[in-house]
């Protein structure tokens, strides 16, 4: 039970970060925010990961760096979309990476995904169409978040193919460090880099950099050794629900019947597609969810 509670707590933290990040990037440049966020995450993981990085070798380090740059691209798209649409929409559309993962595996590796996954695609796509028809968000924002979900799905599939033989903590550290480097270059090129000011920005940076990323990874690793895969999947399915809860209570999201119906359809699509995604990833889908919380 403590492990399940810990996992649910982590998903609640992920849910509230969407609200915090939306508020922060309204007053602090997007790429600068993400660069600092990944700098904090990398620094937090540096101590426990430092002795393990050598074990990755050159191939592992290069692979981690490449996947880290993909991760940075996904976060940039997701956060740009979050700026333009609602917190609740962002949470549910981001969750569509579960639906898209089997499709990307099909395209790249001809993996079979089954009728349930196709059903999930259809239902989730219908939900996305319903969300795009409301006035609370924006089609452009929703599409940016959907593009982020596609990048996350690609990153997941490549991760499963090339990373299982490497230490998870060391590989994650390299990914986060590479994401930081890539985002830093963009922030400097745009002239956006500056010292963050105010609790709104620093609060979001600390929660996303320390609790949602680095400590979230450690809690997740501890908890998943002490509970079943079924309970883990149950806990992680709460993330979009938490996002909607905090979007409604803290960000004032009012999506109406059509919008909330779209969220429900996307959630149903995720539930339908998740078994196929788990098969594609040899049961490792839950261990990768951490990467795509705000």
Segments from the language model and where they lie:
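C-terminal-most transmembrane helix of multi-pass membrane proteins
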Residues: 1, 38-39, 128, 201-203, ...
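Glycine-/small-residue-enriched transmembrane alpha-helix faces in small-molecule transporters
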Residues: 1-32, 69, 73, 77, ...
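Juxtamembrane helix-entry segments on the extracytoplasmic side of multipass membrane proteins
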Residues: 1-4, 25-31, 35, 56-62, ...
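Specific transmembrane alpha-helical segments of multi-pass solute transporters/efflux pumps
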Residues: 13, 17-18, 46-94, 130, ...
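Transmembrane alpha-helices of multi-pass small-molecule transport proteins
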Residues: 26-73, 100-104, 151-158, 172-191, ...
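Helix-helix packing/entry segments at the starts of transmembrane helices
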Residues: 35-36, 90-98, 158-181, 213-249
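C-terminal transmembrane-helix exit sites in multi-pass transporters
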Residues: 44-53, 97-119, 241-261
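Hydrophobic transmembrane alpha-helices of multi-pass small-molecule transport proteins
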Residues: 45, 71, 113-132, 149-152, ...
